[in-house]
Amino acid sequence: MNRIHITLCHSLCILVLVFSSKLAAVEPIRVVLEFTPDLDNGRRSFEICARCHLPEAWGNDDGTYPQIAGQHVNVLMKQLLDIRSGRRNNPSMQPFVQERTIGGYQDLSDVVAYISTLPMNPAHNRGPWPEGSAEYESGERLYRQHCSSCHGQSGEGNNELSYPRLQGQHYNYMKRQARLARDRLRRIEPVMASLFTTLTEQDFDQVLNYVSHLPVPVSDLAPDTAWRNPDFK
């Protein structure tokens, strides 16, 4: 009886620890989203981010840095908190998201709100296969089958559920992230991890090619590629 009691207690302790760790991961984003953003402070905090992501938050065509302009507030916040806590392995970002560098929860709230107001690059990096090609059509079919239920029919994502906006993201960046996830160098949600047992590398290339060609609403775009963030002139 004592052995059974000890085993039950041990199992309950494990369940409590697992639940607590999951709650701890979710709770900060709920707390931070309660703050009222200060866009002026967000602009100042963004100076740290602009060193890599550029003042326009457009990132790089080669996929080194993503376009973060126009991304959902909840998505940006989740990514920053995941990197800060170590849930997401990103050594290049790790030093810049710590409290000693960018500040506390209020500062995070401010900077993600500021980023979300920036217009997107009207000429982001796209994949090699144009609409009408066999690869494009294959990518569209796979996207509808595996991705659209979370990321939306047009790649618009979902702010409330923290599903990233994919439309407008650089093709080379998405390919790099897919390879990191495939090689288990980036932690991803189980529903995403299951795709790597279903889809081939060629499938992923075609899906991401299709995503990179999804149109971004004109209202979310900068007027042209010559646009420069007026806050950084």
Model-derived features: positions:
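Bacterial N-terminal signal peptides that target proteins for export
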Residues: 2-12
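N-terminal signal peptide c-region/cleavage motif recognized by signal peptidases
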Residues: 20-21
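Disulfide-stabilized extracellular ectodomain repeats and their linkers
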Residues: 46-49, 65, 73, 144, ...
